[in-house]
A protein has these predicted regions:
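A glycine/proline-hinged amphipathic helix-loop "lid/cap" segment
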Residues: 1-104, 347-348
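Alpha/beta hydrolase fold serine-hydrolase catalytic domain that processes acyl esters and thioesters
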Residues: 2, 186-187, 202-348
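Glycine-rich nucleophile elbow surrounding the catalytic serine of serine-hydrolase chemistry
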Residues: 193-203
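Short beta-strand-to-loop junctions in surface cap/lid or active-site-entrance loops
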Residues: 102-113, 270-275
Length: 348
């Protein structure tokens, strides 16, 4: 019986156990399993990432874009739970922020008042919630010593553009006004998120500068910034590396109303005018990510406008690495570095 046939018959829970076991193997053993390295655009795919993609292919998992919306959302939650693991944290409590569901993560040993990150999850504006990014938020908070409040903004297609943007801005304004109730120091507030959440975070940072709201730092993890142009990385990596062209097209069609303007800076921050006083940024991109080039273009735009920016490409990783801290060594190391950057910026 071929291995691919065995893997395809396993339940998702057992597949996750197999994945964790194989990703715990020494790198040379993983390399023998997956064969020669994948090299593209002068970059080599991390061995554990290559193994993960290989196992997903064997499992014949349908892409989220092929499923009915609610099934796709459930699949993301399921996969994130399997890949993120149960990360330790001092305490967690659910609350409401600007009439939106939210979750506060307080790291072990946190002082009564300290730095606070407002986090917006990824998922193409149509998937993702507090559960899908629970492990990532736990990991970031505990490793950085920074409180995190994750916000569950409205999703498309039920709530189309600019609903998510409006929710993100409202949530940040609420946090500024109520920081003390969360244990947040108003002088050490940050905003951050991954993918679509990175887009929202970039938008909030611009609003904060225009409105004079306190914001000390922005953490943008493989953000989408340009809904118009097709970049080189989008051509190179939109098949076979987790985030597909079909998924991105569905996300665009779900979130943006028919006839909408994809150059609207609330959707594509690359087209925004950068005001004075924008918070310093750390922009993380993945080498094998279709969104790589537009994320890096936004980092350059900020820098050209005088914003203090650090850009870091993780050349061997793929889109979504924030969600696999429980199984992937290379992804876990990258997210640990994100936590260190957050700690350094805010003094966690």
């Amino acid at each position: 019986v071929a291995l691919k046939d065995v893997v395809a018959t396993l339940t998702p829970r057992v597949q996750a156990t197999v994945l964790r076991g194989m990703l715990a193997l020494p790198e040379p053993v993983q390399r023998r399993l997956v064969g020669k390295p994948v090299v593209r655009d002068g970059q080599t795919l991390a061995t554990d990432v290559q193994l993960s993609l290989w196992l997903q292919k064997l499992a014949k998992e349908p892409g989220a874009e092929t499923l009915p919306m609610e099934e796709g959302r459930a699949a993301l939650r399921r996969h994130a739970a399997a890949a993120g693991g149960r990360q330790p944290i001092g305490s967690v409590r659910d609350l409401t922020v600007a009439d939106l569901p939210a979750r506060l993560y307080v790291p072990t040993g946190a002082p009564a008042t300290g730095p606070l990150l407002v986090f917006f999850h990824g998922g193409g504006f149509m998937h993702g919630d507090l559960e899908s990014h629970d492990a990532a938020c736990r990991f970031l908070a505990e490793r950085s010593g920074v409180r995190i409040v994750a916000v569950d903004y409205r999703l498309a297609p039920e709530a189309q553009f600019p609903a998510a943007y409006d929710d993100a801005c409202a949530a940040y304004r609420w946090v500024v006004a109520n920081a003390a109730s969360l244990g947040g120091d108003p002088a050490r507030l940050a905003v951050g998120g991954d993918s679509a959440g990175g887009t929202l975070s970039a938008g909030v940072a611009l609003v904060a500068a225009r409105e004079g709201l306190p914001l000390a730092f922005q953490l943008l993890v493989y953000p989408a910034s340009d809904g118009v142009r097709r970049t080189s990385s989008a051509e190179l990596f939109s098949e076979g590396f987790y985030l597909t062209r079909a998924y991105m097209e569905l996300a665009n069609d779900s979130y943006m109303p028919a006839g909408g303007d994809f150059t609207d800076p609330r959707y594509s921050p690359l087209y925004a005018d950068i005001p004075a006083g924008v918070a310093p940024a750390f922009v993380a991109t993945a080498g094998f990510d279709p969104l790589r080039d537009e994320g890096e273009a936004y980092a350059r735009k900020l820098a050209e406008a005088g914003v203090r920016v650090e850009l870091k490409r993780y050349p061997g990783l793929i889109h979504g690495f924030l969600n696999i801290v429980g199984v992937g060594r290379s992804s876990k190391a990258a997210v640990a570095e994100l936590a260190a950057k957050l700690k350094a910026a805010l003094g966690g």
